Amino acid sequence: MSFIKNLRTAAIAATLAISSLQAAQADEQFFPLQSYRVGPYAAGGTGFFGGFIDYLNLVNTRDGGVGGVKLTWEEGETQYEVERGVEVYERLKTHPGIAAWNPLSVGIAYALIDRVTADKVPLLTINHGRTDTTDGRVFKYIFPLLLNPYSETSGIVNYIAGKVGGEDKLKGKKIVVLYHGSPYGKETIPIYELLAKKYGFTVQQIEVPHPGNEQQSQWLTIRRAKPDYVVLRGWGVMNPVALKTAQKTGFPADHIIGNVWSNSEEDVIPAGDAAKGYVAITSVAAGTQFPVVQDIVKTVYDAGKGNLEDKKRIGTRYHNLGILNGILNVEAIRIAQAKFGKRTLTGDEVRWGLENLKIDEARAAALGAKGLFHSINVSWDNHEGDGSVAFQQWDGSKWNVVSDWIAPDWKLLRPIIEKSSLAYAKEKNIKVRTSIND
């Protein structure tokens, strides 16, 4: 009898243990992080993922999670390499309660499109990614939030037009695009050619092989070309090397326009005085003046839980972009919980939250992020969210905003995006959605 009693006790204990495990999993929303903290792009990786993790820590510590659901995460080092990124995906994809993937890598994002679609888990590519994934009718689970490569290009050309006296004054001008030799760098080749034809300027596109620590021949070519402006589509070490090499060849820094991955403190400080006057596009502001950043300092860093090793990087461009990425992920979860309940959500439910993600100035202020970014208005068929951009100029010690928020030319861009996305749908035999319920 004692044996049977003990067996029953053990069975009850095992059942309780399983129930406890299920409850623990039910109270967890998991983020698998394909981060990169070593290699030539470590500055971007440590800053962005540091900010992302800092915001998740803030929400857990200050708010007890989202609707009582704790936010958890695990990092996998990719070194910004596609193969490693896919390996991390395969290793972590079975973890319960995955909210979304956030690789911050165009190459990894491309490799995951079919995988996340099959697994029904969102993939967020803030400020980057495949341009036509903006069309949510075709790419149900991919979200190039705030800015895609084509809208970035439109913003840059609009800014240059303003500097030369208007769009009609672009005719006859020469623009060189110096781009990183990767899928990310090559993404905008077609749109620059299209805009050159539209406005009548000449464009010359020059590749810099990865990682970009030698550019002498490219800048000699630029010197011979004598362009009016150079657009720098760099990443990591390529950016300060470009600015220093430009100075050596006599090209003025204030006629170099950096893209969204050439706009951080880590891009200009190593270049020294060669960066003074340099201009770059941005979708997120730098600085620690924002209440959400101050909350992170007080709640996370003062408690010894901050993710950045160097506290001087708090509030820098990459760090603030990571914080903003955290805000967008968490808000999508909050919105989805309002519909599906305060519990662990499925990836598909988080996708619904993302397709209803709307943050105006009032909501941004409530989140402590007023002025950190402009706004976002995602819908089931527009996965970018009508992001706006601004331009900033480096004065040798800090970035100064030199423009208002600028909206891309959506009337021009949307038909181009849809043509590409519908061709992809035909190739992959994807049924084009007609509503959020599809």
Language model segments and positions:
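Periplasmic-binding protein-like
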Residues: 92-106, 124-126, 174-179, 205, ...
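Bacterial N-terminal signal peptides that target proteins for export
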Residues: 1-11
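Venus flytrap/periplasmic-binding-protein-like
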Residues: 78, 124-125, 130-134, 211, ...
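Hydrophobic helical h-region of N-terminal Sec-dependent signal peptides
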Residues: 9-21
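Beta-alpha junction/loop-to-helix N-cap segments that form part of ligand/metal-binding clefts
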Residues: 28-30, 43-53, 57, 61-136, ...
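Extracellular/periplasmic Venus flytrap/periplasmic-binding protein
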Residues: 84-87, 132, 140-250, 287-294
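Segments of small-molecule ligand-sensing domains
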Residues: 307-319, 330-403, 437-438
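Extracellular/periplasmic periplasmic-binding protein-like sensory domains
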Residues: 139, 246-326, 405-409, 413, ...
